[in-house]
């Protein structure tokens, strides 16, 4: 049984506006490799690789979240940067959500500093879904324990894409109405905490934005779950459960080619 608690915000419709935007931030894969011993770790002495660009070195996208040396082999689905801008006529805030493991404070500050003042944003939140199936964006999951897996060129692109997504959301601002929902999950939902103190937040929180005619503009969903369902042997870039949630909310869930 699903219980939903809904509150509707009393904001003057002509003043309250919201805008959404999204764009892919999937890294480009260059070299190819074969995991000979199936340990999901690249070892030049054991595994085979192809120097696609002919530069004499293994150009890897090092995947974050589990062991070191986990080099991506393919792309299952796109990683996304999703932005929402909320403006109540007095304050304008921007939220950027990205399918990354995490983002360092220095990087987030640089994103904020590069956003033009003319855009009128009072606050910008840059959020990572904590995706364990994307590139290393924090320097902890490179080719060895003491070597970073961060690609500087990708990080520069990431910052530009964040700002572009934010601008698109501003351009998409439109009159909106807002409602809030708190959804307790089924006790069988597989959320675990293996480290003390055991703290589990099993509620789903949602903010829905509608046009005055009732049609949906977009939503914000918060659910405390590790984005790591593909687990540590996966070598394909994917947005994992966060991507499935976004696509399911936006387009519905299909099973055996049927919308359920």
Predicted regions and their residues:
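Sec/Tat signal peptide C-region and signal peptidase I cleavage site
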Residues: 9-13
